[in-house]
């Protein structure tokens, strides 16, 4: 995203330790935004983000990520297609447990295929220690990083809202209402603060999970918690980390093509389910401009800060929804 790009640019200026203090500032702003959402209520958010805005934003979340999937897949298209086809077959034809893990099946088949053709170097796995704790960076206070990072928060906050609505569509549950958007936003903020204080990587909502849930139909939050704990446990095993790093980019790219396309399809389904009338010129303009600004790579720069991608497009959609007069003849 544009926000992540800005973070990496500032890392070069303020150093990684200084950037960590900026992340704490981002988490703090997230917390303040969650209080605002709590104060104004769900109705306020739904007025800002009606289906005509949320639908194309979800589509954009998927399509904006598609480029990275293609770039990874094109390193070895045959291998990427093997992984993609395996995931599709497991999802459509698999039974029982096999149908619940199509992504894992695609990665395993792709990995084994790559091994068969000698495309994987197992030397780093053999040389890696069994136990290797992740390296953290001791943060340091940099007011310049803090001041810069505060406005950067706008983009990920908007993306957070879009991701929550996307997961709503996939699961059929209303997470905006229960546990509440203010709580999900606060959780994101607290995670950023903790990451900044211990010198770890920044965190945000992860769109790929939405695609995975859409494919597997597993909507129990307990599964996500188990996956999170498993990830933490695996992080201290050096050989596991090395093995995961050895997975060819093309294999992951093939899987991502399916995941990102699924997210875009969720957005299209959102427009259909909410009966968004694209025969209405107002709705057509809002949807069209959100998509063209996002896919076209439009960006606005001011004061060294860049607003682009999903953040800019969603903000544009909110603005158009508020200022364009509603049709008197069409719903």
What are these regions (language model features)?
Residues 103-182:
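Helix-loop-helix hairpins and the membrane-proximal interhelical loops
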Residues 37, 58, 81, 129, ...:
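Juxtamembrane loop-helix boundary motifs flanking transmembrane segments in multi-pass membrane proteins
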Residues 151-221:
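Membrane-embedded helical hairpins/re-entrant loop segments and their flanking transmembrane helices
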């Amino acid at each position: 995203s544009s926000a992540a790009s800005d973070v990496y640019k500032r890392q070069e200026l303020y150093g990684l330790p200084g950037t960590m203090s900026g992340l704490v500032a981002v988490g703090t702003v997230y917390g303040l935004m969650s209080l605002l959402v709590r104060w104004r209520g769900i109705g306020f958010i739904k007025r800002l983000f009606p289906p005509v805005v949320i639908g194309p934003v979800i589509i954009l979340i998927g399509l904006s990520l598609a480029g990275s999937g293609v770039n990874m897949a094109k390193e070895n298209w045959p291998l990427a297609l093997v992984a993609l086809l395996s995931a599709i077959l497991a999802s459509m034809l698999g039974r029982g447990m096999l149908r619940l893990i199509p992504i894992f099946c695609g990665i395993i088949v792709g990995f084994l295929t790559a091994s068969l053709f000698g495309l994987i170097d197992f030397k780093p796995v053999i040389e890696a220690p069994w136990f290797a704790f992740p390296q953290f960076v001791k943060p340091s206070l940099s007011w310049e990083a803090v001041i810069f990072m505060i406005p950067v928060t706008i983009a990920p906050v908007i993306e957070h809202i879009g991701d929550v609505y996307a997961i709503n569509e996939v699961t059929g549950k209303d997470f905006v209402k229960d546990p509440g958007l203010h709580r999900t936003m606060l959780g994101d903020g607290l995670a950023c603060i903790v990451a900044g204080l211990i010198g770890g990587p920044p965190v945000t909502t992860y769109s790929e999970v939405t695609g995975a849930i859409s494919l597997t139909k597993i909507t129990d939050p307990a599964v996500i918690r188990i996956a999170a704990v498993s990830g933490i446990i695996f992080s201290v095993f050096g050989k596991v980390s090395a093995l995961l790093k050895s997975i060819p980019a093309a294999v992951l790219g093939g899987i991502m093509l399916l995941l990102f396309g699924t997210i875009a399809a969720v957005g299209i389904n959102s427009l259909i389910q909410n009966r968004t009338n694209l025969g209405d010129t107002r709705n057509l303009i809002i949807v069209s401009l959100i998509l063209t600004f996002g896919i076209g790579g439009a960006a606005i720069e001011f004061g060294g800060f860049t607003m682009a991608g999903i953040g800019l497009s969603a903000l544009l959609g909110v603005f158009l929804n508020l200022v364009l007069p509603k049709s008197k003849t069409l719903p």
